[in-house]
Amino acid sequence: MRIWIDADACPKAAKELVCKFALKRKLEVWMVAGQPQVKPPFACVRLVVVESGMDAADDYLVEQAEPGDLVICSDVPLADRLIKKQVAALDPRGREFDARNMGDKLAMRNLMADLRDLGQMGGGQAPYGDRDRQAFANALDRLLTRLQREAGLRANQPHK
C-alpha cells in the first residue's frame, strides 16, 4: 500500500501530516506534481515532477495508483477516476470520496464552477486552518487503518 499526494494542490500542513502517519505506519509516500516542490526530508517520501501539461499529474496518479492505495487530492474529477479504479481518495480537509457520494460531489463541483463563471460566486475555498488539519488527521487515521486491515485480509486469502 502506498500513499499518493496530488502535491500541487495539497496544503503544506496536510503533506506534513501524511509524512508523519507514513513514518509511523512504515508506508511509502509519493508526491506527484506538475511543478518543482520541496521534498520533505524523509526516506519514505518520493517526489515525481511530471512534464507540464493539462492534467499530467492527474493522469500519472491514475496510471500509477493501484487498488488499495490512497490518494490525497482536492480535485473531484481526479477522485472520480481513482474511485472507479478502486483507489481510495481523501481530500486534505478530511472528506473521503467514495462511489456513493461521487455523483453528488461532481454535480456540486460543476454547479460551483458554473456559478463562478457567471460571476455569481467568488473563487476558492477558505484558508486551510486548524479544524481542517484535525479533520484530515482523524480521517487519514481511520482510512489508513481500514486500508491496512483490508490489505492484510487480501494477503491472507489463498490464491485461486
Swiss-Prot record:
UniProt family annotation: Belongs to the UPF0178 family.
HAMAP family, A to Z: UPF0178 (MF_00489)
NCBIfam families, per database record: PRK00124.1
Protein name: UPF0178 protein PSPA7_5991
Organism the protein comes from: Pseudomonas paraeruginosa (strain DSM 24068 / PA7)
Source organism phylogeny: Bacteria, Pseudomonadati, Pseudomonadota, Gammaproteobacteria, Pseudomonadales
